[in-house]
Amino acid sequence: MVSYVKGPAYKALSHFGKLNAPLVRSYIPNLVFWGAAAGGAVATFTEGVPLFQKTFYEKIPFFGQHWIYNPDPEDVPV
């Protein structure tokens, strides 16, 4: 026999404005993807800027040596 319910069972979700936990959780993969893409774009477009080279890129372990400027003595003007 089928058990009948007297009325609909409502559940209140905790929210902040129109944001609730399941909604925010569904956006996390997109935010991670676009955040990584934005970080990659910033890294690409600031690679040639000396301020970024000295501040960030030279301090990267193992790969930081690529951005350290060390010219040959023959190439330096006197």
Curated annotation (Swiss-Prot):
<keyword id="KW-0496">Mitochondrion</keyword>
<keyword id="KW-0679">Respiratory chain</keyword>
<dbReference type="InterPro" id="IPR029027">
    <property type="entry name" value="Single_a-helix_sf"/>
</dbReference>
<keyword id="KW-0812">Transmembrane</keyword>
<feature type="topological domain" description="Mitochondrial matrix">
    <location>
        <begin position="1"/>
        <end position="26"/>
    </location>
</feature>
<dbReference type="GO" id="GO:0006122">
    <property type="term" value="P:mitochondrial electron transport, ubiquinol to cytochrome c"/>
</dbReference>
<feature type="topological domain" description="Mitochondrial intermembrane">
    <location>
        <begin position="47"/>
        <end position="78"/>
    </location>
</feature>
<keyword id="KW-1133">Transmembrane helix</keyword>
<keyword id="KW-0999">Mitochondrion inner membrane</keyword>
<comment type="subunit">
    <text>Component of the ubiquinol-cytochrome c oxidoreductase (cytochrome b-c1 complex, complex III, CIII), a multisubunit enzyme composed of 10 subunits. The complex is composed of 3 respiratory subunits cytochrome b (COB), cytochrome c1 (CYT1) and Rieske protein (RIP1), 2 core protein subunits COR1 and QCR2, and 5 low-molecular weight protein subunits QCR6, QCR7, QCR8, QCR9 and QCR10.</text>
</comment>
<dbReference type="GO" id="GO:0008121">
    <property type="term" value="F:ubiquinol-cytochrome-c reductase activity"/>
</dbReference>
<keyword id="KW-0249">Electron transport</keyword>
<protein>
    <recommendedName>
        <fullName>Cytochrome b-c1 complex subunit 10, mitochondrial</fullName>
    </recommendedName>
</protein>
<keyword id="KW-0472">Membrane</keyword>
<dbReference type="Pfam" id="PF09796">
    <property type="entry name" value="QCR10"/>
</dbReference>
<dbReference type="InterPro" id="IPR019182">
    <property type="entry name" value="Cytochrome_b-c1_su10_fun"/>
</dbReference>
<comment type="similarity">
    <text>Belongs to the UQCR11/QCR10 family.</text>
</comment>
<feature type="transmembrane region" description="Helical">
    <location>
        <begin position="27"/>
        <end position="46"/>
    </location>
</feature>
<keyword id="KW-0813">Transport</keyword>
<dbReference type="GO" id="GO:0045275">
    <property type="term" value="C:respiratory chain complex III"/>
</dbReference>
<dbReference type="GO" id="GO:0005743">
    <property type="term" value="C:mitochondrial inner membrane"/>
</dbReference>
<comment type="function">
    <text>Component of the ubiquinol-cytochrome c oxidoreductase, a multisubunit transmembrane complex that is part of the mitochondrial electron transport chain which drives oxidative phosphorylation. The complex plays an important role in the uptake of multiple carbon sources present in different host niches.</text>
</comment>
